[in-house]
Amino acid sequence: MKVTISQINPKTLDFEYNFNLIQEKIKESDVDSLIIFPELSLSGSPLYDSISYNDTHNKSIQYADKLSELKKDFIFGLPINQNGEILNALAFIENGELKAISTKKNLNRFDKGFSLGEGFCTIEYKKQTIAFGFLEDLDEYLKKQDKADLIICSSNILFTPETQKELLTSLQPKIRKAKTPIVLVNRCGAEASYIFNGSSFFMLSNGDLSKELPLFEESSLQIDTQKTEKYTQSPLCRIEKMYHAAVLGIKDYFRKNNIKKALLGLSGGIDSALVVVLAVEALGKENVIGVLLPSEYSTSHSITDAKASAENLGIEYYTIPIKETFTSALKALSPIFEGKEPNVAEENLQSRIRGMILMGIANKIGAALLNTTNKSELSVGYGTLYGDTNGAIGALGDIFKTDVWEMSRWINRKEEIIPQNSIIKAPSAELRPDQKDTDSLPDYDILDKVLFLHLEQSFINF
């Protein structure tokens, strides 16, 4: 049997866009191929409260009917309203006719508002028995020990560096036991803060991987389920995966929100130096603007490093010193501040001035501000509200500080793109003389290990 895996990147609630995308993939496929699309491919996801909107369901029906007019064989995902219950569904279309529907039974956090469905569905197709449904319902289906010639799963799997390895490790013994090949189709792309990794695949009945689509890219691949060739993986390293995920997050955020220009502050530190590389990779150097905002506490090497970071990438950049604005603010606040020892108030004021200037520029030129706070700082609240926490999207929001350094070294493996001094110098907010992050925080090597245990492995031991 010929099956086409169609790994697409839909836009949430943009039914017209998603319809055209699905239609294009269907028309590109062979006439006699069954085309498989990811979960909620017609509506996009996550849907959250929008699944209760009448417009969501009206458009779902409208565009599903238009897809049926193509007179092809395919499986696609959409929300349906069945007797007043909203279900996450997969529709099996054969030659323009709806032949079967699988509704999701084991719901996850993205399925808020959906009712429990019935799980896997079995259908006869071209003299073969096909079981199709959602990845979350697969274990329950396999326990029934029903015999099928092919299993088809649609999914929306979130990216982590270990996602694919963990999925394959979990799935292989189950497929060997079932002695049934499986096609798994996963969406790719980013939606707000969520990254979907793609990496759809075809696994043989002995658990060997036969075909795999790329990480993070829209891609289609036709397979013959009767062929048993084994696929040899060439996996990316952990940091390389994280790099491409971060680039995709920026790229899709700007594309899906119809924003062209990105703006960010360049401090000469490692975080902004990494974010500007990610932004240029995602948007092109012509669409990225840097702003240096030095203060009286900024070291000369910070300014030099910030300029080198911009010039190495060929982006447009400006220098706007904040000393005069800071002095004016202190003068305005002197009736309250006078006679009191300088403290965090003066430090945060500088950060807020920078945030104000950056947001002012972003608003004036129609750009979106990129936040450069890393996951370590974010997790412990090491930042200034309305200052360095400003931004439309946090490019490093899921990347620990130690990984920021490792990713920067990986980027520089062939040539110096990120200034070496930004990588090796001690991190500092430079809001007071000789300030270092370690004045307030443990060494990042220690902090990140603690944060990883709590945030990534749910370790609790009070």
PLM region descriptions:
Residues M1-G265, E281-N287, L292, Y317:
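Enzyme catalytic cores with a strong preference for nitrogen-chemistry domains
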